[in-house]
């Protein structure tokens, strides 16, 4: 396989797509060069996606408005399967660890669920889970 240097190793560039495996197999077994051309629209529709989250966040504060505690629950659409080499649980794990953000919260708990669906696989992009959790917390 010949792939030009595109820099980085995250997002779509960091995974092994099923089509790439099939192309290698075809080329070796057909003893013939195989070319795969995919436009941007096809890639974005059929390849891995991310950031389809659902949040339930409850904040507890005293009479002066100081936050005393936060309870969170997140459901992450993980798609039909993991995008190798990443786990479909990565987004949910990040939500749990970064939901409080920069705030000092004396009591914090959060549950995250990665749910398998019939959609394209989940792929962590730059800023894994941060878009949804920042929106939910604020």
Region spans (language model):
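Structural alpha/beta core scaffold segments of enzyme domains
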Residues: 1-138
């Amino acid at each position: 396989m010949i792939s030009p240097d595109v820099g980085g190793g995250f997002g779509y560039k960091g995974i092994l797509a099923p089509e790439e495996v099939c192309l290698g197999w075809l080329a070796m077994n057909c003893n013939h060069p195989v070319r795969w051309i995919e436009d941007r629209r096809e890639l974005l529709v059929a390849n891995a996606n991310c950031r389809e989250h659902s949040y339930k966040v409850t904040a507890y504060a005293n009479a002066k408005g100081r936050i005393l505690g936060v309870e969170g629950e997140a459901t992450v659409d993980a798609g039909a399967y993991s995008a190798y080499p990443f786990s479909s649980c990565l987004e949910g794990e990040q939500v749990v660890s970064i939901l409080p953000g920069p705030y000092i919260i004396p009591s914090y708990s959060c549950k995250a669920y990665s749910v398998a669906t019939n959609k394209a696989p989940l792929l962590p992009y730059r800023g894994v889970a941060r878009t949804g959790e920042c929106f939910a917390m604020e």
